[in-house]
A protein has these predicted regions:
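Expand to "…catalyze enediolate/carbanion chemistry for C-C bond making/breaking, isomerization
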Residues: 1-166
């Protein structure tokens, strides 16, 4: 599960993704929004770092998702079923979503680490399509190098500098 942010701007991130990942971002964003809109503390994926980073900032994730949908529409990728699900979810839960900008997004160091690791991982997924992200491999700085299996991404929810700013589930 991931929300790819190879660039700070949501629309630029959407434009950078290949069709497969672009379409998947719409689905994964919906899944994250659904988890965040569910009060069940045992809900699947509730503690995944991709979910935690958007907790309390669901409105920003909605804007990210809409940037993905807009780009998919430009490319002629069908989004009608996804939009139906998203619209229904927003109608039910949108009033409870937080719309402020996440602290990690406002921090240039955190955002640079996040976008660089996303570029590096996109490159490894499809080196031909993402050839322009090659340089990110050398400067990628994921978190948790001490883990048995280190993270491939920089997760703001794992970073002590930002973990306290990531809202926790009630």
């Amino acid at each position: 599960m991931q929300t790819f942010l190879p660039f700070k701007q949501f629309d630029k991130s959407a434009q950078a993704l290949d069709n497969k990942r672009l379409n998947k971002q719409i689905l994964e964003s919906y899944q994250i929004l659904k988890v965040l809109s569910n009060d069940d503390p045992k809900a699947a994926w509730r503690n995944h770092p991709a979910v935690k980073m958007w907790r309390g900032f669901e409105g920003q994730l909605w804007l990210y998702t809409m940037a993905m949908v807009k780009e998919a529409d430009v490319r002629g990728i069908k989004t009608d079923k996804n939009m139906e699900n998203l619209t229904n979810l927003k109608a039910v839960a949108g009033d409870d979503w937080g719309y402020s900008i996440p602290n990690w997004y406002k921090n240039p160091f955190a955002l640079q680490r996040l976008t660089t690791t996303h570029k590096a991982n996109l490159y490894t997924k499809d080196p031909i399509y993402y050839f322009e992200f090659y340089d990110s491999l050398a400067t990628s700085n994921p978190c948790c190098p001490e883990r048995k299996e280190p993270c491939k991404y920089y997760w703001v929810a794992h970073d002590p500098k930002f973990a306290s700013n990531v809202k926790v589930a009630a």
